[in-house]
A protein has these predicted regions:
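Alpha-helical scaffold segments in carbohydrate-active enzymes
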Residues: 44-47, 51, 118-129
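Substrate-binding groove/exosite segments of carbohydrate-active enzymes
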Residues: 1-114
Length: 173
């Protein structure tokens, strides 16, 4: 994809897939002392944290910001494509982990101060949209899904769920 794409209609529309693909490309950067390579990712995170405010407000009636499964050069943040992947609202939370990793590796408090509004906005979104699970009263993200995973439902296959483990871990982080 990117400059290597020779297709008029490329796979995934050449979007950034934020349910592991984009994140995985940057995992080695801090641990290999190549922190500067994160700058394009950090710019993307800042931009989707801005466009994601509108998505949070319109789709969820919530403050903060949200990024679903994909974004692109226009920094779209809403649910798109198919339900097994597109309805997942935790792409922004996962990308925030990269901001936190930068701080953990560098101890740069100025950097942390500069990205704190982004981290806070993602947390605020989840604080406002989580609901109580009816049996145990746990707070869970709903609706959600485990991206690209289809599970057995009452009447066949289902994708939308409440309290997916992936969401729980990302919010915990």
């Amino acid at each position: 994809q990117g400059i290597w794409n020779d297709k008029l209609f490329p796979s995934w529309d050449s979007k950034y897939t934020c349910n592991i693909n984009l994140e995985m490309n940057y995992w080695p950067s801090e641990v290999t002392n190549l922190s500067d390579l994160n700058e394009p990712l950090f710019r993307l995170i800042k931009e989707v944290s801005e466009s994601g405010k509108e998505t949070a407000r319109i789709m969820y009636g919530a403050n903060g910001w949200v990024l679903h499964h994909n974004t692109d050069i226009w920094r779209i943040t809403g649910a798109l494509d198919k339900a097994p992947s597109g309805m997942w609202p935790s792409g922004g939370a996962w990308l925030c982990r990269h901001l936190w990793e930068r701080y953990l590796y560098t101890g740069d408090t100025e950097f942390l101060r500069s990205v704190y509004p982004i981290l806070k906005g993602s947390g605020l979104f989840f604080d406002e949209i989580m609901v109580k699970e009816p049996v145990h009263n746990w707070l869970v993200v709903c609706p959600s899904n485990s991206p690209e995973n289809v599970h057995s439902g009452n009447d066949g296959k289902a994708t939308t769920a409440a309290g997916c483990t992936m969401d729980n871990q990302l919010i915990f982080d």
